[in-house]
Amino acid sequence: MDQDALISKEDSEVEREASGGRESLSDVIGFLDAVLSSEPTDIGGDRSWLHNTINTLQRPGSTHRAKGEGEGEVSTSSTQDNRSGEESRVSGGTSEPEAEAHARNVDKQNIHWATGRGASTDSVPQDLGNGRDSGILEDPPNEGGYPRSGAEDENREMAANPDKRGEDQAEGLPEEIRRSAPLPDEGEGRADNNGRGVESGSPHSARVTGVLVIPSPELEEAVLQRNKRRPANSGSRSLTPVVVPSTRSPPPDHDNSTRSPPRKPPTTQDEHTNPRNTPAVRIKDRRPPTGTRSAPDRPTDGYPTHPGPETDATKKGIGENTSSMKEMATLLTSLGVIQSAQEFESSRDASYVFARRALKSANYAEMTFNVCGLILSAEKSFANRVDENKQLLKQIQESVESFRDIYKRFSEYQKEQNSLLMSNLSTLHIITDRGGKTDNPDSPTRSPSVFAKTKENKTKATRFDPSMETMGDMKYKPDLLREDEFRDEIRNPVYQERDTEPRASNASRLLPSREKPTIHSLRLVIESSPLSRAEKAAYVKSLSKCKTDQEVKAVMELVEEDIESLTN
C-alpha cells in the first residue's frame, strides 16, 4: 500500500511539472484534429434504453462497494457504466460477480495508465475520436485513459488470460485507485487532477497507446444495432451539465428523479434505501467547468460515433479526389481559363501539375507542399509575363523614336519642296507675262501673250491733289502703299496675288494701276525672302523704277545674292 501511494504521489508530481510545456501545444493540436474529424450524432438525445437494459442486471445484494462501509466507495464514470451495459447486452450477462469484473476493468485501466506514461501524442486523435468520455470531472487518476476496446474483446481477453488480475496486482499499482475514496475536486487536487484542466491541455489522451484496436466486424455490427435502437431525438440537446447514470440506475419509473434539473442534486434509489451509505452516483460540478471539453467533444452517450480520423480521412480522400478534380476542371472551363476538362488533366504546365497534385494529396503536409509549388509556379509565370511586357514596351518605344526621326526628316523635305515650288511659280509668271519672247530689247513695253479686246486708255486731266507731290511716281497707287503696311501678315503671296487685300477700300480698287503683273510677282518674291524689312523696301523701290528688262534682271540678281549670303 505504501509503495502504491508513493507511485501515485510521484506520478502527480511529474504530471504537475510536465503539464505546462511538454504536452500543452501538441496535445491541443491533436485534440483539435480529433474534434474536427469526429462527427458526433444525437448528443444529449434520449438514452432511456440505457436504463432499460442495465436494470435487468440489478441484484438486491450487489452494491458499488467492494469493501465495507468504512472504506469509502469507488467513483464510476459513464464510460464504465456504458461498458457494463454493453457487456450485458452483447454477451447476454456474465457469470462472474459484478464487483470482481469491475475491479478487473479498473486493473486494466491502471496497466494502461502505468505503461503509457512516456507515450507520444500520436494516439491523441484515436482516443479523442472515439468519444467515450462523458465530460465528468471526477475521473480516476488514470487520466481518463479507459480502454476503448469493445465488450466482446474484453470478455475474450479475460477468457484467454485468467491470471490477468494477478499480473495486475504484481505490477505494484496504486491500491487507492481501486479501493479508496475518490480524489478531491477542489483546490490543489483539482489542479493536479492528472491533466483534466485547460492548462495541461488534454494529456490523458497521450497516456494510452495501443488500446484502440482496429474495430472488428462483430463490434461494428453491435454499434450499428445500438445506433438503430437509439431514438433520433437530437433536438433536445442540453447545454447544462447532466447527471451521469450509475451502473445501479433505478427502474424506468424513477427516470424523472434521476434526470432532475442540474441545479438540484438528484435523489437516487440508493439514497432512498440506504441514506447512510455514501451514494454511488457522483454529481457533476454545478459550475460550467472551464477546463473540460464541451459536449460535442465528449458525447455523453459514450459510444464511438467515429471509427477514427486517420482511417476516415484516407477513405474520404480516395473518394473525393475524382470529384474535386472534376469540379475544378468544370470551374476552369466555365471561367474560360481552359477549353475543356481534358486540357486540365493532361496539361504539362507547372501550375496545372501542382494544382492536380494538390487536389490528389492525401494529407496536410503533401497538400501544403503542392500549394507552395502552385504559388511559386504562378509567380514565375507572372514574372515571365512581366518580362515579356517590358520587352514589348521597349520595342514600342524604339519604334516611336524612329517614327519621330522619320517625321522630322519628312517635314524638312516638305519645306524644301515648298520653297522650290514657290520659286518655280514665280519663274512661270515671269515667262507667261513676257509672252515667251526673250529677244526683244527694242520694244519699250512688254506685251502679254494673250491679247484681249480692250478700249484704249485715254489720258484724262486730273485735278491737283496735294498728296501727289509727296507720292512722286507712285501717285495713283494708294493700294500698294496700303498693302505694305500689312505685308508681315500675308502668309501665302501666291494667293495674295490673285486676291486683293480685303482691308483695302472699294474706292482704292477702282483706281487704275500702272504696275505690270511681272513687276508685281517679282515684288512678291522680294517680300517673301528672308531679307530685312529695310532691304525689302529698297529693292521694291528700285524695282518699281526699272524701265527695261536688263534693269529688272540686275535688281533680281542682287536680291538672289543677298538671299544666298543669308542662307549660307
From Swiss-Prot:
Residues 50-61 have a biased composition (Polar residues). Residues 479-568 are annotated as: Interaction with the nucleocapsid (N-RNA). Changing residue 454 to I: In strain: Isolate E50cl9. Residues 33-41 are annotated as: N0 binding. GO terms for molecular function: RNA binding; RNA-directed RNA polymerase activity. Residues 412-445 are annotated as: L protein binding. One of its GO terms (biological process) is viral genome replication. Residues 344-411 are annotated as: Multimerization. Residues 1-24, 38-319, 433-462 are annotated as: Disordered. CDD domains: MEV_P-protein-C_like. Keywords: Chaperone, Coiled coil, Host cytoplasm, Phosphoprotein, Viral RNA replication. Gene3D superfamilies: 1.10.287.340, DNA helicase RuvA subunit, C-terminal domain, Viral phosphoprotein oligmorisation site domain. Residues 7-20, 99-110, 150-168, 453-462 have a biased composition (Basic and acidic residues). The modification Phosphoserine is found at residues 249, 257, 260, 447, 449. InterPro entries: Paramyxo_PProtein_C, PProtein_oligomer_dom1, RNA_pol_Pprot-P_XD_paramyxovir. The N-terminus consists of a long intrinsically disordered tail. The central part contains the coiled-coil multimerization domain (PMD). Forms a four-stranded coiled coil structure. The C-terminus constitutes the alpha-helical domain that binds to the nucleocapsid (N-RNA complex). Homotetramer. Interacts (via multimerization domain) with polymerase L; this interaction forms the polymerase complex. Interacts (via N-terminus) with N0; this interaction allows P to chaperon N0 before encapsidation and form the N-P complex. Interacts (via C-terminus) with N-RNA template; this interaction positions the polymerase on the template. Belongs to the respirovirus P protein family. This is Phosphoprotein. It comes from Sendai virus (strain Hamamatsu) (SeV). The gene is P/V/C.
